[in-house]
Every structure is written in C-alpha cells, then in structure tokens.
Amino acid sequence: MIIGTLISLAVTRTKPADIGKAFFDGMGSAYGSIIGIIIAAGVFVSGLTATGLVKAFIGAMLNNPAIVKICASVGPFLLGFLTGSGDAATFAFNEAVTPHAQEFGMSIVQMGSMATLGGTLGRTISPIAGATIICAGFAGVNPVEITKRNGIPIVLALLVGTFFLAQG
C-alpha cells in the first residue's frame, strides 16, 4: 500500500499532504470496518449463546462425533455465505465452539483452521459480500451470477480442504 502511494505521488505529482491525507483516511476506514466486524461477531456469538444455540450445537456434536469434522468447516461456510463476512463467521465459530475442540478429539489449531477455511470460502461465494457486489458492478452482472459461476469450484475447495485438514 505504501509503495503504491509513493508511485501515485510520483506519477500524478500530487501534493504530498493530499496523498498522505487520502492514505490515512483509507487506512482508518478499513481499520474501522475490521473492528466493526470483530465487535459484530462478538455480539452475534453472545446472541447465539443467550438463545442456547451454541450449547445445542456443541451437544449435537458431542452426541455424534462423526459430524464434528464436517461441522467445523461447513458451519462457518454457511454462516459466511449467509452474512457475507468470512471474518464474522470465523470469529463467531472460533469464539463459541473451537475452545471445545479437545472434547471432540481435535486440536484447537485443527478446528480453527477448518473454521477459517469454511468462513473464507463461504464469504467468497456470498452474493451479499462487498467484494462480490463490487465485482458484479464492474462486470455489469447480478451478484447471484457470480455466486452461480463460482459455486461448484468453491464447494469442491471446501470439500478438499476439509478432507486434508480433518486428517490432522
């Protein structure tokens, strides 16, 4: 980002003060969005916990250990797809479920990696994700068209990634 800023300064011959202001405005805006997502994920987890959904989810996984490795990646994947935010999905899952990984016979790193993969891939094909909306605008298509086009490869990536991460 800094290199790009310096190159744009040299090419456009803009005042350094104007470039600096734009650079730090952009950084602050991006940083604020990230903090907002993290806070929203924490509030979301609190809501899920308050409604008993987290306890029910953990109970279902404890009663059926065969689904744990699938839920560790598919749960955040679906959450990322529905919310358009892979970070919110991953933070929510890792805050609520991953601390219990050893109860499911997995390491925290293994379950956390599976959740990260799932959340990231879910956001990637979400028609309401910011990146999808921007790309659709550039291409002049509906965001759902991008989701349709990328759906099969992303689901295959989820399955392959889950398979390898589940091996431990």
Spans of features found by a protein language model:
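Structural signature of hydrophobic alpha-helical transmembrane segments
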Residues: 1-3, 56-66, 116-126
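Core transmembrane alpha-helical segments of multi-pass membrane transporters/permeases
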Residues: 2-53, 69, 78, 82
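Juxtamembrane helix-boundary/capping and inter-helix hinge elements in multi-pass membrane proteins
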Residues: 15-16, 29, 105-109, 135-145
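Short amphipathic alpha-helical coupling elements at transmembrane boundaries
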Residues: 21-29, 56-63, 98-103, 144, ...
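Loop-to-transmembrane-helix entry motif
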Residues: 26-34, 64-68, 118, 128, ...
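Hydrophobic alpha-helical transmembrane segments of multi-pass integral membrane proteins
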Residues: 35-43, 48, 63-99, 103-104, ...
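Re-entrant/interfacial helical elements at transmembrane boundaries that shape
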Residues: 56-57, 87-100, 129-139
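Juxtamembrane and boundary regions of transmembrane helices in multi-pass small-molecule transporters
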Residues: 124-168
